[in-house]
Amino acid sequence: MDEFKPEDELKPDPSDRRTGRSRQSSERSERTERGEPQINFDDIELDDTDDRRPTRAQKERNEEPEIEEEIDESEDETVDEERVERRPRKRKKAASKPASRQYMMMGVGILVLLLLIIGIGSALKAPSTTSSDQTASGEKSIDLAGNATDQANGVQPAPGTTSAENTQQDVSLPPISSTPTQGQTPVATDGQQRVEVQGDLNNALTQPQNQQQLNNVAVNSTLPTEPATVAPVRNGNASRDTAKTQTAERPSTTRPARQQAVIEPKKPQATVKTEPKPVAQTPKRTEPAAPVASTKAPAATSTPAPKETATTAPVQTASPAQTTATPAAGAKTAGNVGSLKSAPSSHYTLQLSSSSNYDNLNGWAKKENLKNYVVYETTRNGQPWYVLVSGVYASKEEAKKAVSTLPADVQAKNPWAKPLRQVQADLK
């Protein structure tokens, strides 16, 4: 069955029409027959200004732009409202406040940094001035020329007091030569003595012989490095009692060392004059001199030595004969000690080793098959000390050359050339 469509009503059905003339034409013909006037629609002119009947489509079309205009107007109104609402938000003054706070905080931070820099700078400058004041106030004058008794009692000398012995001297260097030459010997002033330290630089000052040599030099020096035992001998004033108390506290072994230092510069004169005679006389005189006490021997050698130097030679040979009795009585020695005593003091010997144990030192020398070695006893810090030497050489160069002939184990000990005057001073 066909569906009904609204367009079907508008379509004319051809079956309904009459055959032949149409209805309008029939009516028109009837009117003409009756004589009624007819209206010719073709002659009628219609004004364009007349309103035609609007159709539905035209109404819908006319309504659509109106709706669009209303929508546009509503959108414009909403946009205007939004603009009106947004403008106050942009014009708020709250945004300017945080900016001003930031600037304030930045300014405060800069001020704090400046204060810190100023404080640190002042703190760094302040200790320099205070330390200079402290050092200036803490300076003390030290006078080495003061009396030894004052140092023992804790009394410091006055800052302005000076002695005639410690006067300043001008130091002048020798001129430099254009060609290589040997070094000039410095001029020895009064009261001074040149000291040559033998051996390696690493262990030269630790060896007992060098220490004893420095102690001997210190005795002859003008500085108050030793106890004031010389003061009562020269002056004989009221400080004699204090000097005796100080020397009594120290061991008795140091007393001969001080008295020997007085004889040292004068002993070579006696030995040079009496070289041919005392070689044969010394062993004979040691036998009757053995019972002599050891305390009397230093006194006999120290007091008459300055007077007997100008007298005859046989009188001077008696003093070394008495001194040789003291080491022969209680000292431990090995080898020909007499050859060291009788040799000239200007000669040299080789010191191979030293120890506090005599047996170990003597056994080591025998183990190395050493020839012409001598072990003699001396003192070190108040205790017995034994020294091993070998050979007698006319010069220092010969002694150094002889080191190459020694065994390898002995050369490892760094033997060094030692003046015989030091050995002879130790044997006294």
Curated annotation (Swiss-Prot):
GO BP annotations listed: cytokinetic process
Recorded phenotype for the gene knockout or disruption: Deletion mutant shows no obvious phenotype, but absence of the protein aggravates the division defect in ftsN or dedD mutants.
UniProt feature, compositional bias: Basic residues: 86-95
Compositionally biased spans, kind Polar residues: 236-257
Miscellaneous comment text of the record: Overexpression induces cell filamentation.
Domain commentary: The SPOR domain binds septal peptidoglycans and is required to target DamX to the septal ring.
Protein name: Cell division protein DamX
Originating species: Escherichia coli (strain K12)
